[in-house]
């Protein structure tokens, strides 16, 4: 998919088209007032106050028609520079623009505006030369958005759109968007019965249905078994803690905006935890440790809660409560490289076995100029960042450095993936931390009997299970590998009167093998039942008629398409082997 923020020409084109849309809206609704209209990864949007008018699907064609009329007129897009006083006078009737102007830096004495015909907007640019260049556009959708993202403010109307240089490119992109909608985990999750949301329960609080929780448990067991084979130990800690825990860790200072409000419980203050590391630090300090005990790899599938604005929530990809595939490796400085390599190796192994191919590595470093966000210790940061660079270079892994993206306590390696809709997301992470062990005064005894501070490696191979499931549903288009499918086999007798007994026999044999099987023997026509199973993306459908019953065979449909015939015994061996080997294909 194109990224309109990263391509300068597409950025300028979509920026200008946002102004074109605003101009058209102003023509149709003269009282309209405008907040901001930025370029985003998938095009642009503009937040608009239309008073009592609510934009509906029926209004979009009229706006597009007016946009085409303005574009055909071909006015030049002209930049002006005015003083702050002139800007305040120009936009005196628009409270949203006044707010932008008044919040500008005091040293910003010159303000830029862009005009096209009868429309002028505050803007830094860039833009194309004329509105005629914006003729190949499409308005995509509309929604509500709180002014400034604050739920206490008025809801503005947000209209999304996209613009491409040619009609052919626009049509191709719109086709990509349609395909992306089909891959969106929110659609697939509904079709497959993975999870549900309820406003009564709360926004961003997913509830996993039987199919979803089956998938969850399979992934959890898979990653836990991987960790056990690599010497991890698993623990369980509570999903909240005393506020002093987060003062000690520094989360309250550096991460408070992402935390839920503090709760008063009798004479103590508690908070829902946003991360698990403070609990694991305390757990490490429960015992005395020798260098012989290290590395100590403490892992947990842990429940966390983070405050996310309602506008940022997205299915189960971005939620307010989630379970993290977390681990903290306590090690000596000499063990950093081998442990870090072990984590990267595990990430690559898991991705290979799950068939995840499209990803990239990003090395997130601190911004040395930021004295607020990061723990201040230049020697520690330089050592940590160089260690991670050395490991990645030794492994021959291509990576991109991201300045200012590190955690407050240390640099990190993130694995980025592209979901069907929206921005890139982090799937896996590995972070080096010299800071938290010092904050919690953690120690181990070295071979000379001296007390030393361990290093901590934070890592999450699948990130959060919620996000991993969301991404994997999109990556596979819902066609999960057999071993991960909530329902692996659906048995469909053609006629219950004649074929149900044979169908029940097969169901029992499959259950004895540990295969998740359903009997689809409703009174509906066979074609309807098959379509039903196709929508649910059940990997294997067994259609049983007279021939299959009489010859003790089965007719398989694999992912609703390829058809095979086998004896019953051959099929039982086949499906068990595919399941046990965690095969990606059928």
Task: Walk through the language-model features, giving the residues of each.
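NTP/phosphate- and nucleic-acid-binding module
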Residues: 1-35, 39-586
């Amino acid at each position: 998919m194109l990224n309109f923020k990263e391509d300068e020409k597409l950025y300028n084109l979509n920026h200008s088209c946002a102004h074109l849309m605003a101009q058209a809206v102003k023509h149709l609704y003269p009282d309209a007032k405008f907040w901001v209209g930025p370029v985003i990864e998938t095009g642009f949007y503009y937040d608009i106050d239309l008073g009592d008018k609510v934009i509906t699907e029926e209004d979009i064609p009229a706006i597009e028609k007016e946009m085409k009329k303005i574009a055909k007129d071909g006015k030049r897009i002209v930049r002006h520079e005015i003083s702050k006083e002139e800007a305040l006078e120009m936009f005196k009737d628009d409270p949203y623009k006044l707010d932008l102007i008044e919040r500008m830096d005091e040293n910003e004495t010159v303000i830029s505006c862009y005009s096209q015909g009868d429309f002028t907007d505050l803007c830094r640019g860039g833009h194309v030369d004329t509105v005629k260049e914006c003729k190949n556009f499409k308005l995509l959708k509309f929604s509500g958005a709180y002014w400034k993202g604050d739920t206490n403010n008025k809801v503005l109307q947000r209209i999304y759109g996209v613009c491409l240089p040619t009609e052919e490119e626009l049509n191709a992109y719109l086709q990509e968007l349609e395909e992306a909608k089909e891959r969106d985990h929110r659609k697939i999750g509904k079709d497959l019965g993975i999870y549900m949301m309820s406003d009564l329960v709360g926004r961003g609080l997913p509830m996993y249905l039987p199919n979803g929780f089956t998938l969850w448990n399979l992934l959890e067991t898979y990653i836990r078994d991987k960790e056990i084979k690599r010497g991890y130990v698993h623990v369980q800690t509570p999903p909240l803690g005393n506020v002093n825990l987060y003062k000690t860790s520094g989360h309250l200072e550096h991460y408070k905006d992402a935390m839920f409000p503090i709760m008063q419980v009798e004479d103590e203050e508690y908070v829902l935890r946003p991360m698990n590391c403070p609990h694991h630090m305390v757990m490490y300090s429960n015992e005395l440790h020798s260098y012989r005990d290290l590395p100590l790899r403490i892992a947990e599938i842990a429940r966390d809660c983070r405050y996310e604005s309602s506008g940022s929530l997205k299915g189960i990809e971005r939620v307010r409560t989630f379970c993290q595939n977390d681990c903290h490796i306590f090690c000596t400085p000499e063990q950093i490289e081998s442990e870090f390599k072990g984590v990267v190796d595990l990430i690559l192994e898991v991705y290979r076995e799950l068939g995840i191919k499209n990803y990239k590595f990003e090395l997130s470093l601190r911004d040395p100029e930021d004295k607020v966000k990061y723990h201040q210790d230049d020697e520690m940061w330089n050592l940590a960042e160089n260690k991670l660079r050395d490991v990645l270079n030794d492994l021959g892994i291509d990576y991109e450095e991201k300045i200012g993206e590190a955690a407050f306590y240390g640099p990190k390696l993130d694995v980025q993936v592209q979901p069907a809709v929206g921005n890139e997301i982090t799937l896996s992470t590995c972070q080096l931390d010299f800071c938290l062990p010092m904050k919690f005064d953690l120690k181990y005894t070295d071979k000379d009997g001296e007390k030393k501070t361990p290093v901590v490696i934070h890592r999450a191979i699948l990130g959060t299970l919620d996000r991993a499931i969301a991404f994997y549903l999109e990556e596979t288009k819902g066609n999960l590998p057999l071993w991960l499918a909530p329902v692996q086999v659906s048995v469909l007798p053609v006629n219950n009167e004649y074929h149900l007994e044979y169908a029940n026999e097969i169901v029992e044999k499959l259950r004895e093998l540990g295969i998740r099987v359903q009997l689809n023997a409703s009174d509906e026509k066979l074609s309807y039942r098959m379509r039903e199973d196709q929508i649910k993306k059940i990997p294997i459908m067994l259609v049983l008629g007279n021939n299959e019953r009489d010859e003790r065979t089965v007719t398989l449909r694999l992912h609703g398409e390829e058809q095979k015939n086998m004896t019953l015994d051959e099929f039982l061996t086949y499906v068990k082997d595919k399941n046990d080997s965690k095969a990606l294909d059928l």
